[in-house]
Amino acid sequence: MNGKKLYISDVTLRDGMHAIRHRYSLENVRQIAKALDDARVDSIEVAHGDGLQGSSFNYGFGAHSDLEWIEAAADVVKHAKIATLLLPGIGTIHDLKNAWQAGARVVRVATHCTEADVSAQHIQYARELGMDTVGFLMMSHMTTPENLAKQAKLMEGYGATCIYVVDSGGAMNMSDIRDRFRALKAVLKPETQTGMHAHHNLSLGVANSIAAVEEGCDRIDASLAGMGAGAGNAPLEVFIAAVDKLGWQHGADLYALMDAADDLVRPLQDRPVRVDRETLALGYAGVYSSFLRHCETAAARYGLSAVDILVELGKRRMVGGQEDMIVDVALDLRNNK
């Protein structure tokens, strides 16, 4: 660690959207953002779970627009930066400009781990706006460390000043994480930061985040009570407690985070965010974590097991954006019964 302070990036108000079908009220957003700000996290990501303009038939409609959520958070935050997520093809540079005007100062431009080339315009425009611009390589387990590093290098070339390893499926272990960070560090400029976004489907979210920091990672994503897709993200309060015991600098108030997790976030969960049969299947099969709620809906509709649908999606190597295929897979399984 060399005494450097970790950058703590909270994702409760973006990835956490998946856990409650994108239904945060504006008051929920204000309360959670204020609690996070008071606890001194560095950034607070706010958007539909699938990023700017994710509200749709395919991904699920949000209770509010991205801009309403961003403005609600920006109104109460005094210290942290407001971040947002953009997936090229869903969000546009027009949406990015609107998010900037609403108060977002950090953007994570997210692509599948082999498709960094679709992010060039969005990264370049974010830099022109003066945003803290991050490249976000989703489903990082689906390519080799060497290929991931090549994609990271592309994003760096477009202007991203931080590149994330993103374990969207919660499918990686500590060795997988170490290999990917070593590969990135070997090709990126020394001044380019790296970040880790974990999911907890194999209960390794905190361990993988610690392994990333040991390999020189600068920024860590986490969420209150793990609020996120699948079994959730690395639980923020657990990660802070663990690294505090290691003597690492994080700048956050552990007890304030513990209170916010239990008092503000956990009561909102209509489906517990935890490792269970379905979320473990996500991690084991290497499936995009936000498929969980969609699969459970399809399973109920067609009289199937959500686990069977998830495992089949994993076999077919489905990735984020292919939510429409969940029903196709369910119908295939039903017809083959």
Swiss-Prot record:
A Gene Ontology molecular function term of the record: 2-isopropylmalate synthase activity
EC number of this enzyme: 4.1.3.39
Keywords in alphabetical order: Aromatic hydrocarbons catabolism, Lyase, Manganese, Metal-binding
Signal peptide positions on this chain: none
Record-annotated site: Transition state stabilizer: R14
Binding site for Mn(2+): D15, H197, H199
NCBIfam families for the chain: 4OH_2_O_val_ald (TIGR03217), PRK08195.1 (NF006049)
Family: Belongs to the 4-hydroxy-2-oxovalerate aldolase family.
Subunit (UniProt): Interacts with MhpF.
Protein name (record): 4-hydroxy-2-oxovalerate aldolase
Organism of derivation: Escherichia coli O157:H7 (strain EC4115 / EHEC)
